Amino acid sequence: MLLLFFLNFLYFSHAVFIDKYRDYKDYKYYELTGSREGLENLKKFMLNVDESLIHSESLNKSEIILSPHLVSLFREAVKKENLKVKILHDDISEIIRLEKGNTRRRIKKFSWNSYYDVNDIHQFILNTTKVNPEWTELIVAGQSYEGRKILGLRINTPYENGQRETGKPVFFIESGIHAREWIAPATTTYFINQLLTSRDPDIRRLRDQFDWRIFPTVNPDGYHYSYNVDRYWRKTRSLSSNGCRGADPNRNWDYNWGQHSASSRPCDYQLYAGSKPFSEIETRTLSKYISSIDNLLFYVAFHSYASLLLLPYSDSVEHVDNYDDLVQIGQRSIEYGSRVNGEKYDGPGTAAETLYKASGGSMDWVRYALKTPLVYTYELRGSSFHWPPEKIPEQGDEVVQMMLGLADGAKELGYY
């Protein structure tokens, strides 16, 4: 019995206690510019050399984090493809070390000058429901592969008799689907706090107009792993038949699955789309919860980083039937956000036109399968995945205003 307990303990604690912390000592961080074809050729070549290659891309720029032993090979490939290369960080471990110095557990009070592990984010959600029982309701959309709850928060104006107000349009926010994009859950919890504590009449109006369903970390296993073991981990933590871990949960939804910017190789560090649509329990259970919502008007996903506002569809340049409305409402959102710090997002436009083609994402599935009228993805600001923790409120205030812009724009066009 004791042996069985020990084996179970090892299995369920694998991510934290067996995997060695990856410090990325002497890893180089490069920015590449050039032709789209050249950038794509370089990426394919380097991925054939190293499936764990860390890369981020847009239409005419790529960024790569590279092991020191691959630098010579990389420079030869860059020369062959006639690309321009710029080194952003000579040793990325220093950035991670400084960031980790600002991550700490605060038991008494959750704040927005540090990044928190998923357990602390969940505790924030639980505490919020306890402090605001008349306004909030805990949502458990399901469980992750490793058994963590997929926790969300419902915020809705109560009637005077204490009953929830029904019939309002639903505003759904999804965040943290990609584990390494820490600023997304941080700004989402900041937004929750502002909805419930701000005395600004515009923010109170925003709160009262909708039935809110907000999920700060829809990939809790991946986020926990990124926080504790591998900073650049992006996927879930499911186990494939060949022993490799995880699938990209934003390539795993059942809309044109596996067609663009998706890998069929389970050991692909970033883009493995899973063995089939909704193979991941996180996407499967979340999709069931979303499907159960009546009167869903807005679906918003937060990612990082690019300062972009994206529209469906991600794998096609064809426009949805209310594309012009989406653009007009999105422009209002960008305008409102720019008032905070003078920073302006690019877009709005389809992901296929403004970023790159990608299939199997949540935004596209929600639009196609559920016919949700107003669907957006925000690629938050920054020049890397390392947004300074002391500047979380800066992004948070922009997000608050951008959500207000969406609401005002939609109301002006008669969506509610």
Regions from the language model: what does each represent?
Residues L2, Y11-Y416:
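M14 metallocarboxypeptidase catalytic domain recognition
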